[in-house]
Amino acid sequence: MSAQVIAIDAMGGDFGPRSIVQASLACLSATPSLHLTLVGQPSLLEELITGQSAADRARLTIVPASEVITMDEKPAQALRGKPDSSMRVALELLRDGKVQACVSAGNTGALMALSRFVLKTLPGIDRPAMVAAIPTQKGYCQLLDLGANVDCSAEHLLQFAVMGSVAAQTLGIARPRVALLNIGTEDIKGNQQVKLAATLLQAARGINYIGFIEGDGLYRGEADVVVCDGFVGNILLKSSEGLATMIAARIEALFKKNLASRAVGALALPLMRRLQADLAPARHNGASFLGLQGIVVKSHGSAGVQGFQSAIQRALIEIQENLPERLHGRLEDLLS
């Protein structure tokens, strides 16, 4: 198998480089074809990678970057004021062909602004979109946009649908069912842009558009790709994660309530742990920036080791599936 080379913004995120480096080293050990480039402060990173085997160390490179973009920094400031940030250097490595993907847990707005500036968008795409996998009763669905674009035109939603459909195909779904998230399934429901997007999708070649979908339909697994603007998508994503955490906590508290419930809980514990692991936000961490001339995956800023590993794994899949090239080909056909 040919090598996959990924740049890691090692300084991004809420907690600094420790968990990012730990996740990177775990992925390196588990994937013999993987090569990682850690971007950040060399002295700090060298301390965190001690103890690696010679074979793993040979597939690990450190590239220096003297600046760090904070989580509360404005995108314009990050774009103009920090030319040697770890985030920007990682993206420039991708632009220059030295790596095949970039993964960052840093400031979302800054990452989007820098990605658009450094990498540019694919022809036919006005705005990149963030997409992630959401667990459903039947598996997973790809939800986009997740916050990159708060206000979207019908044409933007069409572009998101095309990109989401191709992303789902890379995950093994031959003919993804594409739906628009709406407040009802009837044709008269929704705002003007959503209604216009429905008309565009009905006429689009090669898109398996199935109509409007409500939030409960998403979780029942009625679609493989669900499209919405970033305002709605971000709220849905964060609500889903919060709900999963709350349900797990409530069930755990219920089983600890008294002696009888503890006995029942002991019997149900293996099943509950499996369910918790399946729904845990960390397992689904990693939102792809679709529509760029390169692979960029955004991890939650608060992600731990397991969560950041999931983001790296998503980047690996997109490298193996040549996602930007496939997107480019489909966009030429569908948006021409």
Curated annotation (Swiss-Prot):
GO terms for molecular function: phosphate:acyl-[acyl carrier protein] acyltransferase activity. Pathway: Lipid metabolism; phospholipid metabolism. SUPFAM superfamilies: Isocitrate/Isopropylmalate dehydrogenase-like. One of its GO terms (biological process) is fatty acid biosynthetic process. The keyword Transcription regulation does not apply. HAMAP family: PlsX. PANTHER family: FATTY ACID/PHOSPHOLIPID SYNTHESIS PROTEIN PLSX, PHOSPHATE ACYLTRANSFERASE. It comes from Pseudomonas fluorescens (strain Pf0-1). This is Phosphate acyltransferase. Catalyzes the reversible formation of acyl-phosphate (acyl-PO(4)) from acyl-[acyl-carrier-protein] (acyl-ACP). This enzyme utilizes acyl-ACP as fatty acyl donor, but not acyl-CoA. It comes from the Bacteria. It is found in: Cytoplasm. Disulfide bonds: none annotated.
